[in-house]
Amino acid sequence: MNKRINEVSGRPIGEYLSRDISDFQRVSRTLFECFSSLATGATLNSQQLQQIQLPIDQISNNATPNMVLQLMNHLIDVDKIYQNTLKKLEKHQKIQKEITEIQKEIEEKDKLISTLALNLKDIESFLENELSQDNVNINNGNASDGIVNEVLIDLKQPDDAASMDNIVNREVSPEDLISYAHKISGTTSAPFGYQPNAPLASLFKPPAPQDEMMRSSVLFTKPPPHVLKYYGLAEIDVTTPTMAANISSPFSIGGNVGDVTTPTSKEQEDQQQQQQQQQPQQQLSQSQQSQQQTESELQPIQSILQPPQQLNIDLDLNPDLDSSGDDDDEDDDDEESEEVEWD
């Protein structure tokens, strides 16, 4: 038996399965014949007993109970071998199924590789044709036939003349020049009669902000407390009322040490109501104070943001001539008034 079990290696599983089925069939038939011979007293076939190879010393034509027991044990052994062969067959089927699936995947991959190879071959031929055409165009010097020639010509010979022509032919209106000159005039020249210590007129300003302008700007002004609190810069909330002044001690000590008076529950309720009534008034007063502080702090900012007043700058170079003309006009007016009075 062990030899037969160990033999199941290196040979097809179908041969072992067919052999085990035939052995099981032969032993079971012989066992049933022994049962019939015991029941009827008929003789057995000695050739079948020899084929079974039972460990019997004397093989007789008549069935005995000992022979029946040996046949049953032999049938059990053959059945075990047959069951082991079936298990191996099941494993073989699983492995064969996996092999078939892998073969299908390999076939699909082979098809994909073949299609990719064909596409690669087509692309290669297409690129070869394009390169050959471009080489011909480059050798012939026809820049209009291929894109490569156009790029090379643009890189080798930049069109500087055309760009210069565009710059020269570009028109600029006088209004644009005047407006631009007006914008930069306040920072490029000083006013007539400028003095270094005197403040500048509203139309003129220095090219860079001065110290006074920087000090009066928003960067040098301290923001109000509620703004500091909003950005997390204030350590104490100034808008909340302080309750320390309103809280009274529950014990009042008189002149003597022993005289200690404790307030009743009604008095405590009255004090709490008074404190609750005073809280909104204190909050309103503090909010008004904070608003006044913010307004006072924002006044320099508003003064900066307000547009400067227009100043009439007298740029007359000959004030004496103008004054004499004005005097003549006044004399004429006086003469006319006198004539009217005499009339």
Curated annotation (Swiss-Prot):
It is found in: Nucleus. Residues 247-343 are annotated as: Disordered. Residues 317-343 have a biased composition (Acidic residues). Its main location: nucleus. Keywords: Activator, Coiled coil, Nucleus, Transcription, Transcription regulation. It comes from the Eukaryota. One of its GO terms (biological process) is regulation of transcription by RNA polymerase II. The keyword Nucleotide-binding does not apply. GO terms for cellular component: core mediator complex; mediator complex. Residues 86-125 form a coiled coil. GO terms for molecular function: transcription coregulator activity. It holds the Pfam family Med4. Residues 271-316 have a biased composition (Low complexity). Signal peptide: none annotated. Component of the Mediator complex. Component of the Mediator complex, a coactivator involved in the regulated transcription of nearly all RNA polymerase II-dependent genes. Mediator functions as a bridge to convey information from gene-specific regulatory proteins to the basal RNA polymerase II transcription machinery. Mediator is recruited to promoters by direct interactions with regulatory proteins and serves as a scaffold for the assembly of a functional preinitiation complex with RNA polymerase II and the general transcription factors. Belongs to the Mediator complex subunit 4 family. This is Putative mediator of RNA polymerase II transcription subunit 4. It comes from Dictyostelium discoideum (Social amoeba).
